[in-house]
Amino acid sequence: MIEPHAPAPPGSPPSWGGPCGPEAPARLPVRPAVGRFLVLAGVFVCAACGLVYELELVALASYLIGDSVTQASVVLSVMVFAMGLGSLAAKRLRGLAAAGFGALEAALALVGGSSAMLLYAVFAWTGGWGGLWADGPRILLVAFSLAIGVLIGAEVPLLMELIQRVRRQDPGGAVADLFAADYVGALVGGLAFPFVLLPFLGQLTGALLTGTVNAVVGAALVLGLFRRDLTRRARWLLLTANAVVLALLATATVLADDFERAARHAVYGQDVRVAVRTGVQEVVLTGDADGRPLDLFLDGRLRVRGSDERSYHEALVHPAMGGPHARVLILGGGDGLAAREVLRHPGVRRVDVLEADPGLARLARHDPGLSTLNEHAYGDARVRVLSGDAFHRLRATPSATYDVVISDLPDPGVTASTKLYSQEFYGLLRRVLAPDGRLAVHAGPVDARPRAFWTVDATLRAAGLPAVAYRVGARDTGPGPGSVPGPRRAAAGPPAPRGWGFLLAARTAPAPRLDPAAPRPHSLTPDSLARGVREAARTQMAGLPPSTLVHPRF
């Protein structure tokens, strides 16, 4: 596939190609040194835009489809492969390097800039079709990765041709200069995406703005610096193409907010009552009107379902409160619902809620629907909200600080939460627990994903916290609180769990029981708890290795 090239005879002039003749240098409106600088500046900007396109696809795919490690691997590997194809294809354009580069950048700006909006549209309006289109969003993700990769890969050979036409240079030095500008541009794009574009503009507008910058710089470089090498027809074609691309991107930018609202209604239904982006995630509340129960979605995944959240939170909290419980730590639980159940027990003096997203805790405190559901738990003086990384917080926490720890975290299968189900993390929890303290862990649906559930059990035991498993059934087959199978309209995802699985751990294997001094739970009884222990035991898988930071098992 890669064609061999014979070395040029000593003293022979370079083969420039291009419309001005095979050996003619570019006719520039500026001095060669300035022209060379402008080409390298264009390389810098195009590299930054290219990396933003890659990161935007990874981020959006992780949000829409889930499993960020898999999505990053798919996008990056497909894109790098496509870049190789683009480099080979660009050899046919070397004779028309200026016109080819101008057309290439216009196409890349349109495809890359619109990719986030088109991918989100397919997910929102066709994600529930199933059948032959069950993997539609995944197919489109691969298609965009291929297209963007081919276009990015074709840039370098054409830019190499252009920079050599500006001023002849030793090929090794030209490649070094070109790659230096390319890599520095990629650094700037890689830092701009998470720290500027994503928090201030969002994924859709950020991608559209990147496409606009890409189109403007590409057109300016070709139509400004190399315009004398273009025919009149080529100049008008490039000018028209870039004007159309910029008009499309500008129109999409103006309509981005309306599009996002329409897509959100397509995903969640028409009863969206709150939709906010915190500094960490998108939080959506639906229902709580005309008798419809309130549902809470975090980054598109159902986290709380008002119709049966009480069954989940009672099963998570009450068995752990069967012993000393004056000092309680809740991991996650920013919605305040686990804190609500903790505060029902007499003798509780302190409740620390360690939530990675303080914006969610603020919403749970101030939103009328959610604060009513959590019975205004954050208004209790005993409750304190802590934010930040759980690892860092626990490392700085003195030993034996808490009598009870409640782990109200997403399923271990969600990549971002995997480290919070590791042996190292449970070792930190063991240290902060009092000698007779208890740890309750939501470990995912034991029926649907037994291997992941019992891996959590093996990890707890490896950390010196033997556990007793129990399950509680949901009232229907849909995903409920604490389960994170993926966005509601995900085209393909794990099966919806029929119940929730929990592990109650301590330094010595505890006996799950309810606190007789506490108010009676609404749905959990001693008999149902004992039955849940027996049902979970029937699914036990022995001999599983623990999950660690360097070797996650989920």
Curated annotation (Swiss-Prot):
<keyword id="KW-0808">Transferase</keyword>
<feature type="region of interest" description="Disordered">
    <location>
        <begin position="1"/>
        <end position="20"/>
    </location>
</feature>
<dbReference type="GO" id="GO:0005886">
    <property type="term" value="C:plasma membrane"/>
</dbReference>
<comment type="subunit">
    <text>Homodimer or homotetramer.</text>
</comment>
<feature type="binding site">
    <location>
        <position position="281"/>
    </location>
    <ligand>
        <name>S-methyl-5'-thioadenosine</name>
    </ligand>
</feature>
<dbReference type="InterPro" id="IPR030373">
    <property type="entry name" value="PABS_CS"/>
</dbReference>
<feature type="transmembrane region" description="Helical">
    <location>
        <begin position="139"/>
        <end position="159"/>
    </location>
</feature>
<feature type="binding site">
    <location>
        <position position="313"/>
    </location>
    <ligand>
        <name>spermidine</name>
    </ligand>
</feature>
<dbReference type="InterPro" id="IPR036259">
    <property type="entry name" value="MFS_trans_sf"/>
</dbReference>
<protein>
    <recommendedName>
        <fullName>Polyamine aminopropyltransferase 2</fullName>
        <ecNumber>2.5.1.16</ecNumber>
    </recommendedName>
</protein>
<feature type="compositionally biased region" description="Pro residues">
    <location>
        <begin position="1"/>
        <end position="13"/>
    </location>
</feature>
<feature type="transmembrane region" description="Helical">
    <location>
        <begin position="184"/>
        <end position="204"/>
    </location>
</feature>
<keyword id="KW-0745">Spermidine biosynthesis</keyword>
<comment type="similarity">
    <text>Belongs to the spermidine/spermine synthase family.</text>
</comment>
<feature type="binding site">
    <location>
        <position position="355"/>
    </location>
    <ligand>
        <name>S-methyl-5'-thioadenosine</name>
    </ligand>
</feature>
<feature type="region of interest" description="Spermidine synthase">
    <location>
        <begin position="235"/>
        <end position="516"/>
    </location>
</feature>
<feature type="domain" description="PABS">
    <location>
        <begin position="247"/>
        <end position="492"/>
    </location>
</feature>
<comment type="function">
    <text>Catalyzes the irreversible transfer of a propylamine group from the amino donor S-adenosylmethioninamine (decarboxy-AdoMet) to putrescine (1,4-diaminobutane) to yield spermidine.</text>
</comment>
<keyword id="KW-0472">Membrane</keyword>
<dbReference type="InterPro" id="IPR029063">
    <property type="entry name" value="SAM-dependent_MTases_sf"/>
</dbReference>
<comment type="pathway">
    <text>Amine and polyamine biosynthesis; spermidine biosynthesis; spermidine from putrescine: step 1/1.</text>
</comment>
<dbReference type="GO" id="GO:0008295">
    <property type="term" value="P:spermidine biosynthetic process"/>
</dbReference>
<feature type="compositionally biased region" description="Low complexity">
    <location>
        <begin position="485"/>
        <end position="495"/>
    </location>
</feature>
<feature type="transmembrane region" description="Helical">
    <location>
        <begin position="206"/>
        <end position="226"/>
    </location>
</feature>
<dbReference type="GO" id="GO:0006596">
    <property type="term" value="P:polyamine biosynthetic process"/>
</dbReference>
<feature type="binding site">
    <location>
        <position position="335"/>
    </location>
    <ligand>
        <name>spermidine</name>
    </ligand>
</feature>
<dbReference type="InterPro" id="IPR001045">
    <property type="entry name" value="Spermi_synthase"/>
</dbReference>
<dbReference type="Pfam" id="PF01564">
    <property type="entry name" value="Spermine_synth"/>
</dbReference>
<feature type="active site" description="Proton acceptor">
    <location>
        <position position="408"/>
    </location>
</feature>
<dbReference type="GO" id="GO:0004766">
    <property type="term" value="F:spermidine synthase activity"/>
</dbReference>
<feature type="transmembrane region" description="Helical">
    <location>
        <begin position="37"/>
        <end position="57"/>
    </location>
</feature>
<dbReference type="InterPro" id="IPR030374">
    <property type="entry name" value="PABS"/>
</dbReference>
<feature type="transmembrane region" description="Helical">
    <location>
        <begin position="69"/>
        <end position="89"/>
    </location>
</feature>
<dbReference type="GO" id="GO:0010487">
    <property type="term" value="F:thermospermine synthase activity"/>
</dbReference>
<feature type="binding site">
    <location>
        <begin position="389"/>
        <end position="390"/>
    </location>
    <ligand>
        <name>S-methyl-5'-thioadenosine</name>
    </ligand>
</feature>
<keyword id="KW-1003">Cell membrane</keyword>
<feature type="region of interest" description="Disordered">
    <location>
        <begin position="476"/>
        <end position="495"/>
    </location>
</feature>
<keyword id="KW-0620">Polyamine biosynthesis</keyword>
<keyword id="KW-1133">Transmembrane helix</keyword>
<feature type="transmembrane region" description="Helical">
    <location>
        <begin position="106"/>
        <end position="126"/>
    </location>
</feature>
<keyword id="KW-0812">Transmembrane</keyword>
